[in-house]
């Protein structure tokens, strides 16, 4: 399949000045990158606001910030879902799906109120769920991602934050990924 397209940009600010012709998938990727920059700025602003809030330890304040973060996450997931629907089975869909982290259920609804160390149990269940589903959106048979910096970043994050640093745990996690 022959495709002709052109790319023009300012090398000092590629993302904001890139012009693409003849490649809807590349145009969608550029738009995705711009959207993610905006979303990351929005999330950082919420995080900064939370960090400076003198009432951040109050439960209702935490819930309000959590709702804002969840809304930002929903916007990203909706954007990616729309893009994947428009470009199914493409490198763009593979890449965009790879950026997603697992949607963790609200375990506070399933852990009984009278559970000893309830908050710890909720976090424990969330951790194990997240670890189990960390690679759900990853197709290891597709070599496209292996050549991207985001793959190394996600792999490093997995072994740094999801796997206990113990030879047996490291071994089992490596086997799970490779299989």
What are these regions (language model features)?
Residues 1-87, 106-130, 134-154:
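A non-transmembrane, solvent-exposed segment enriched in polar/low-complexity residues
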Residues 72-79, 92, 170, 174:
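Stable alpha-helical elements in mature extracytoplasmic
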Residues 153, 157-161:
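Phospho-regulatory, Ser/Thr- and acidic-rich intrinsically disordered linkers and terminal tails
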Residues 160-179:
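A cross-family structural signal marking well-folded subdomains
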Residues 102-103, 177:
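A short structural micro-motif
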Residues 89-102:
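Amphipathic alpha-helical repeat scaffolds of TPR domains
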């Amino acid at each position: 399949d022959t495709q002709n397209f052109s790319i023009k940009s300012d090398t000092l600010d590629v993302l904001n000045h890139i012009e693409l012709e003849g490649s809807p998938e590349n145009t969608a990727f550029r738009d995705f990158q711009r959207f993610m920059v905006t979303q990351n700025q929005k999330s950082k602003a919420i995080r900064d606001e939370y960090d400076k809030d003198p009432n951040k330890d109050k439960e209702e304040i935490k819930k309000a910030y959590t709702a804002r973060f969840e809304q930002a996450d929903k916007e990203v997931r909706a954007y990616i879902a729309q893009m994947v629907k428009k470009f199914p089975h493409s490198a763009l869909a593979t890449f965009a799906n790879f950026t997603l982290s697992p949607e963790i259920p609200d375990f506070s609804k399933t852990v009984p109120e009278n559970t000893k160390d309830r908050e710890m149990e909720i976090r424990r269940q969330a951790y194990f769920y997240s670890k189990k589903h960390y690679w759900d959106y990853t197709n290891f048979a597709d070599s496209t991602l292996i050549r991207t910096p985001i793959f190394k970043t996600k792999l490093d994050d997995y072994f740094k934050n999801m796997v206990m640093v113990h030879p047996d745990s490291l071994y089992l996690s490596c086997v799970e990924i490779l299989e």
